[in-house]
Amino acid sequence: MSIQIFNTLTREKEPFKPLKDGEVKMYVCGPTVYNYIHIGNARPIIVFDTVRRYFTYRGYDVKFVSNFTDVDDKLIRAANELKLTVPEVADRFIGAYFDDVDQLNVAKASVNPRVTENMDEIIQLISTLIEKGYAYESAGDVYFRTKKFKDYGKLSGQELSELQHGARVEYNERKQDELDFTLWKAAKPDEIFWESPFGNGRPGWHIECSALAKKYLGDTIDIHAGGQDLVFPHHEDEIAQSEAATGKTFANYWMHNAFLNIDGEKMSKSLGNFITLHDVLKDNDPNVIRFFMLSVHYRKPITLNDAILEDAKNGLERLMIAYQNIDHRIQTDDGEYVEEAHEDEWLEQLTELKQAFEDDMDDDFNTANAITTFHELAKRANIYLAKETVSINVLREFLSMMRLFAEVLGLKLENTQTDSLDDSEVEALIEERLQARNERNFARADEIRDILKEKNIILEDTAQGTRFRRG
């Protein structure tokens, strides 16, 4: 079947139809770089990286844009607290961002535009909105006329009348209407600013993404994505600005991931459960964090705690062990492999598992089901490895398919931890242990096993001999 996407705009699953055959234009809202990103921010980063990977696997050329908001009130406050300039704060935490997400095996975006490097495009978009009557200047600020855009609220499912009735009104004499939102903020004393036709100042948050998406992807894009907290007002305002300026549909598909909770509670500074990704990665394998994030469908809330992370670690380890055992069996081929009688049946099973994996991912990128299929693949690999005679063709197909699934999900099946022993040294110790056991020197054999265990190397005694893996 074709790829099906749950579209927040229509509240339905829809078959994906790109603007241009073989190409996907995708924009994902990036972080405001005033601090390390929190662990909840990592969910959309991992989820939409996986969406991108699957499109690539399906043969699409994906143009993937994710921005950095490198000037706003939070950055200005952070600069004052750290006694740095706003650009220095942004540079520090953009660097930290890449350090962290690189560990999560997140592919580089086609472009990561900074707001401050695209100010001309932002100012031009605001000017267009003023010219078309959708925006107005007021004492150095510029505001968007929300009620003039008749489709306002279509993404979040809210009516303008409901917004008016439920608005938390903070009186602002510069606004013509309480629902109008800021496109440009007049400069305050001692704050960073840019020159513009409206006066010195800096952009509001929402206009940035509209301008950047337009510059790097065009007036209409295939997919716009982010966390569900961005549906309103951020993405709603983006639609209003972009479609008012161009007269065209801004994005055909809107994708939003659900929240990450800490022990069942939404993460917040007030609850004292606010955790940065940077801190989580100090104590946890990034491969496990990625596996954990993909173990639940992206539109369902996900809970983080020690027990769930341990489950994720064990689940990932089962896949890694199966992969490493197959690889070891192939690498130690002694020429005794035979043409196994049921080779075609096993290859057919693998074809069916590949189709099941694709069906899972085609169904709104259901990584939870895809991981279940991955575990079924590992289970069958273990069954096959236990056979007395095996086919090298089947083994290689198992290995190839595990690599394929892992690549789509962005998981690493090879052990990435380092130790002080290389493979030849490990093999030498295994040989010494075997000799000790043959000589009934069990104390020395156990000592060697303990030495290897301290080096994070686990031995497995099988009918084919002793194997090792790095745990």
From Swiss-Prot:
Cell compartment(s), UniProt: Cytoplasm
Top-level taxon in the UniProt lineage: Bacteria
Entry's Gene Ontology cellular component terms: cytosol
Ranges spanned by the short sequence motif 'HIGH' region, renumbered to the chain: 31-41
EC number: 6.1.1.16
Family assignment from sequence similarity: Belongs to the class-I aminoacyl-tRNA synthetase family.
Protein name, as recorded: Cysteine--tRNA ligase
Organism: Listeria welshimeri serovar 6b (strain ATCC 35897 / DSM 20650 / CCUG 15529 / CIP 8149 / NCTC 11857 / SLCC 5334 / V8)
Annotated gene: cysS
